UniProtKB/Swiss-Prot annotation:
Belongs to the 4Fe4S bacterial-type ferredoxin family. RnfC subfamily. Gene3D superfamilies: 3.30.70.20, NADH-ubiquinone oxidoreductase 51kDa subunit (3.40.50.11540). Residues 368-397, 407-436 form the 4Fe-4S ferredoxin-type domain. One of its GO terms (molecular function) is electron transfer activity. This is Ion-translocating oxidoreductase complex subunit C. Keywords: 4Fe-4S, Cell inner membrane, Cell membrane, Electron transport, Iron, Iron-sulfur, Membrane, Metal-binding, Repeat, Translocase, Transport.
């Protein structure tokens, strides 16, 4: 009974919710064998043709390359790209690529030399003699990626599935209208595909290997059955035609009955899926030693006169392929890369073929129909009925249009496979897939910005923590350095400070001498000044005598003598009071020079005044005033306390006073005569 149940379950297939049945339009291109076309004169090879980062460039402008030569290094998850033919690298520059907006990607531009020479190829015909890790590395370095449309690096995918996968599924459904690349490849290269499947099974070692193919490909089914006639390790499952049966989650559910959880992947339930084109590329990389330099591309649509499937070299401009298919463009001709439901319109035809290019559709105006105007959603729920991912497209539409990113995320917009079934059935002609693509791009941008902000915050907090640790370490060092020294060290420090202070005090202390004390050389200075005064008096005596004989008044002479005596006493008193204070030596020298200048000036004035007649009354008044001032100064001098006197200044002042006294006496003698 268990054997009957297992046999029944072995061939059982399941179904998924939703899905549509659009016109297939496959007979235009699947009736003719694969063909080669002439090489293009120039190839543009984008460095990024897969999910993930681009590889590191390893060629320069002017280098000559061979077909299959690596143009970039494949380190980590970076997948290398290879030269599609032999020629010369003429540029490494940004170029428009296969993208709805024709975004520019860094590309290697090669001028073909027409020789199409290969690198030296080394195949592993006995691949079982090599380890699984070596096979994965070879697949990765030979640039094999998912050729079903995703472009995920095959080596990375296999590395993550070792010893975790129970079911290996080969996707041969090819459910989208117009596309027949996989169909034709299975018809012409079934044996090579099966060999590639066995290489994948050797690496993953799953419990079962399933090939899922729709029933609208009878020739391909026949070829595969012929190759698998005596095989028991691979099962061929023919499934009903329904779009999108070729989706990874949908085909997994059809063949295994298991559903991939929201936000998860097929590997979460022990399933790994590869495309038939990928299996063929694995065989060529491992057994033949050929990197992926070409792939099958469907050329179809009523605007081409020779539709079919061709071997297209990667990097070939789309224009070159269409021209070889008899492209007859109309006034407003549209060219779609991919199928009519999941593909995108090319802005121009100079973009190159890449690893994920499976179809070039050039429909006529009648084939596409007149463009329909978008109207408001009527909430008919037709989109929800057609959605194969069990989503609510009408709600996602409102959330996307209203920029409600959180609600769109909560309604699992990330699970949308962008199959276009909802837009196909929408009676309001709303391009729902375009809204969903834009919303997912905005959500990804927001998450990327949040991630960058979190990383920046983490770096800032780490820096602040590091600065705090350094500050604490500095404070600890300062505290340890501030420990009090020993008692003997304190005594030595105190003695040194005392010596320094004593030296400073001696250097800044002024020389103070009490009033009345004179230096040892005061007598010599006084004698020298006296001799100088006598010499000056003799020189001035002759003119004074001459002027005196002219008839001076005796009373005027007496008054002048009294004034001179009063001034002399005043100057002596001032000299005594000033000498009692501490004096700066430089200041004393300046004051002495000023006093000498004043004395000379007074002598000159006295000589000039002596020649003029004097009023007796005026002289008497001046004499009385002089006596009064002299008495007042004597009283002030008595009241002023005696202070320390600078001996040098005192000596200078005393000498000046004596000179003036002698001068006054001489003047008096002259007047009396």
């Amino acid at each position: 009974m268990l054997k009957l149940f297992s046999a029944f379950r072995k061939d059982k297939i399941w179904d998924f919710d939703g899905g549509i049945h659009p016109p297939e339009m496959k007979t235009q291109s699947n009736g003719t064998p694969l063909r080669q076309i002439p090489l293009a004169p120039r190839f543009v090879i984008p460095l990024k043709q897969h999910i993930g980062a681009e590889g590191e460039l390893c060629v320069s402008v002017g280098d000559r390359v061979l077909r299959g030569q690596a143009l970039t290094h494949g380190r980590g998850k970076m997948l290398p790209v290879h030269a599609p033919t032999s020629g010369t690298v003429i540029a490494v520059a940004p170029h428009s690529t296969a993208h709805p907006s024709a975004l520019a990607e860094l590309s290697v531009i090669i001028d073909a030399d027409g020789e199409d020479r290969w690198i030296e190829r080394e195949g592993w015909s006995d691949y079982r003699a090599h380890s699984r890790e070596a096979l994965i590395e070879r697949i990765h370095q030979y640039g094999v990626a998912g050729l079903g449309g995703a472009g995920f690096p095959t080596g990375v995918k296999l590395q993550g599935g070792i010893d975790k996968i129970t079911t290996l599924i080969i996707n041969a459904a090819e459910c989208e209208p117009y596309i027949t690349a996989d169909d034709r490849l299975m018809q012409d290269c079934a044996a090579q595909i099966v060999e590639g499947i066995r290489i994948l099974a050797y690496i993953l070692q799953p419990r079962e290997v399933l090939i899922g193919i729709e029933d609208n490909k009878p020739q391909a089914i026949s070829m595969l059955r012929a190759v698998l006639a005596d095989a028991h390790d691979i099962s061929l499952r023919v499934i009903p035609t329904k779009y999108p049966s070729g989706g990874a989650k949908q085909l997994t559910q059809i063949l295994t009955g298991k559903q991939v959880p929201h936000g998860g992947r097929s590997s979460d339930i022990g399933v790994l899926m590869q495309n038939v084109g990928t299996a063929y590329a694995v065989k060529r990389a491992v057994v033949d030693g050929e990197p992926i330099t070409e792939r099958v591309v469907t050329l179809t649509g009523e605007a081409v006169s020779r539709p079919g499937n061709i071997w297209a070299r990667l990097g070939t401009p789309v224009r070159h392929l269409l021209n070889n298919a008899g492209f007859c463009p109309s006034a407003d001709q549209m060219v779609i890369m991919g199928g009519p439901l999941m593909g995108f319109t090319l802005p121009w035809l100079d973009v190159p073929v890449v690893k994920i290019t499976n179809c070039l559709l050039a429909p006529s105006a009648t084939e596409m129909g007149a463009p329909q105007e978008e109207t408001s959603c009527i909430r008919c729920s037709a989109c929800a009925d057609a959605c194969p991912a069990d989503l609510l497209p009408q709600q996602l539409y409102w959330f996307s249009k209203g920029q409600q990113h959180d609600k769109a995320t909560a309604h699992h917009i990330a699970d949308c496979i962008e199959c276009g079934a909802c837009a196909w059935v929408c009676p309001s002609n709303i391009p729902l897939v375009q809204y969903f693509r834009q919303e997912k791009a905005e959500i990804n941008a927001i998450r990327l910005e949040e991630k960058r902000a979190a990383e920046a915050k983490a770096r800032f907090e780490a820096r602040q923590a590091r600065l705090e640790r350094e500050k604490a370490a500095r404070l600890a060092r300062h505290k340890s350095a501030a420990v009090q020294p020993a008692a003997k060290d304190q005594d030595a420090i105190a003695a040194a400070l005392a010596r320094v202070k004593e030296k400073q005090a001696q250097a800044t202390q002024p020389v103070i001498i009490q009033a009345g004390s004179l230096p040892d050389n005061s007598a010599a200075i006084a004698a020298r000044e006296a001799r100088k005064a006598q010499a000056r008096a003799k020189q001035a005596g002759h003119p004074m005598a001459d002027s005196a004989t002219s008839g001076d008044d005796p009373r005027k002479a007496a008054v002048e003598a009294a004034v001179a005596r009063a001034k002399a006493r005043k100057q002596e008193q001032q000299a005594i009071s000033e000498a009692a204070e501490p004096v700066d030596p430089r200041k004393a020298a300046v004051e002495a020079a000023i006093a000498r200048a004043k004395a000379r000036k007074q002598e000159q004035q006295a000589v000039s005044e002596a020649a003029e007649p004097v009023d007796p009354r005026k002289a008497a008044v001046e004499a009385a005033i002089a006596r009064a001032k002299a008495r007042k100064q004597e009283q002030q001098a008595v009241s002023v306390p005696v202070e320390p006197v600078d001996p040098r200044k005192a000596a200078v002042a005393a000498a000046i006073a004596r000179v003036q006294a002698k001068k006054a006496a001489q003047q008096q003698v002259v007047n009396e005569e």
